Amino acid sequence: MLRAAPRSEIRGTYDERPHASTDPQRKRRPGARVSMAGVRIMCTLGPASLNPVVVRELDARRVDLLRINLSHTRIEDVRAAIDLIRACSDVPISLDTEGAQVRCGSVVPGLILETGSMIDLLPTPVQGDAHRISLRPRSIFETLEPNATMTIDFQGATLRVIGLRGNGARAVVERGGRVESNRAVTIAPAPSLPPLTRKDVAAIELGRRLGIGHYALSFAASKEDVASVRELIPSDAHLISKIESRAGVLNMDEIIVGSDAVLIDRGDLSREIPLEEVPYYQKVIVRRANRWQKPVYVATNLLESMVINGRPTVAEANDIANTLLDGAHGLVLAAETAIGVDPVGAVDMVLRCISAFERTHFRAFPEGSPAAPPPEMSASVA
């Protein structure tokens, strides 16, 4: 049976590998954040934070990774984002791929689809409205079948395909709802998609030229997906595989083994697994990663209320504490720092939560989080 490695041992293994920091002594600089628990913080940059003022504030707090989300960044803007970050900070940059996911295109502001209405689904970019929307990648239309269902975003409209026409499809709105631009679309049955988009490949090539040392594979589904990305990134780069689909859960062990770290995206995972079971699978994946001695990050909704408010809820603070008690080694701020009202305040709150965890946890559990064998998977995944 695999041994559960102490948190410090796992962190040491991770940090010994080279990364793209411009300062090789970054971890030992005066004023650098030092965490007894080895908890890493990854911050997503976006409209609220991709500017010199905020990047410098994040650097001052010694966050561990700055994430560029390719799902919300145009390929022509990636170079400028990297240059801006490097001009203000030596924090390593992570390029987070689009991966094997479906998204809708641009739509008119305030679009609401009414239950019972008909809509055309198109493979070519259009300004979406109540009569038509575009989906990408266009390859999904090659295997799309009648009666396939589509859910747009978490609380958006649900569509059912009633027929194919030309290169696109026709659908009926079974549950009305709001549709916003560039939102994830969940299709059942799930289409077969390559692990990387053309945009991902172009971004990775740019990252290689610029010395980017961290890459995240979205929607990792198998060891083959991981291996295919390994072939493209630099040999000394970190590969973080994101477990955020049913296939990723079923193949978690082979994905973990082939990666330098894994990231649990609870939001996307909840599209394919019942919401009430996501906390259970978080614990399973964290324990498996610990047993394979690989760092594991947890993302989505850690401080969701701070996207629009100055303070989190007690439930969110409790979630962070329990995530760390589970054995997670990294916390990911996404919307909180990308589009939130106070990106720096969100990081400060995470730092406070980590500090409280260290003050209390190491007194209560001096040997680390209680290790327990992961329970079996439920029928909803298998």
Task: Label the model's feature ranges.
Residues 1-10:
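Extreme N-terminal basic, low-complexity initiation segments
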Residues 10, 15-16:
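Alpha-helix boundary/capping motif
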Residues 16, 21-382:
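Non-catalytic helical/linker scaffolds that mediate oligomerization, partner binding
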